[in-house]
Amino acid sequence: MMKKLILLALFSFVFLYACKETPTNPKISTSIAAVGTDMAENAVIYEANIRQYSPEGTFNAFTKDIPLLKELGVKIIWVMPINPISKVKRKAKGDLFTSDIEDPAGREKYLGSYYAVSDYKAINPEFGSLEDFKDLVATAHKNDIYVILDWVPNHTGWDHPWIYEHPDYYTQNEAGEIIDPSNPETGASWGWTDTADLNYSNPAMRTAMIDALRYWVKTADIDGYRMDVAHQVPVAFFEKATASLQEIKPVFMLAEAEQPNLMEKAFDMHYAWEFHHLLNDISKGHKNLTELDAYLSKMDTVLAADDINMNFITNHDENSWAGTLAERMPAQKEIFTALIYTLPG
């Protein structure tokens, strides 16, 4: 039977249960026990959007509330990307970039996407300093809470140093121009034009990415990662990256993908997107509990015993692009919240 996982994401936070085997012989120790089965079986994960969490939008404003999160039963904090946001090709309204806006004040109101990273080893100055972030992690550990970072491995922003120093780290067209991410099946752009697609056929780029991942575990003592668009990155890379991180300390890995083979060696948990869309369809009257029963039966055959299927009714992406809970499932949100607390996964 799958280990229990529970997720409730409302606005800028997520609750879930998660678990996986703990690697042996961690090479560093912290003020908190290693990530492991005993902890993760009943762990509540809280997704934090630092910019929107408080009026200040800073690490320090969030850190002061960590004792309150402990009182609420939170065991893992998932922090959305903390890196600086690219200014080159920063999106404005519609298809416009901020560079298309003549008025400087008009440009400044567009803050950019967390997922257009300009430097993997730097802190977004809007949030505070590296020391502020390290204090957040240390405070969490003192309160017996783990911290995982949201990471963007598929692409960078257009002013990332690699753009200028290592253009071969990126996917290029026939004219030798770096391109934004595209659908591998159709070749059409995903529309993420504020980002540049990374080239995972380049071994040097893979090594540099793993180095950046190791940096935050070693420097800030974080406890793992949530990997953005994990289905777009080769599984072999994640397997090597996770093995490298486990050499430093036990880590918890979450994949933003619904791809069971990711959990063989690389990840502890993946997204239950099919289940999420099924709940949306049920709330609209397009499907019923018969389809839900069929889905649950299928999961018993698809997932291995130690795989974790992350059930959720919303997250920061869905809230932004598909609609709020009040818009998508106004009459069912409380019922579905209770439902995900009772289902396996």
Regions found by a protein language model. Give the residues of each.
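Active-site beta-loop-alpha junctions enriched in small/polar residues
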Residues: 51-53, 82, 152-154, 230-232, ...
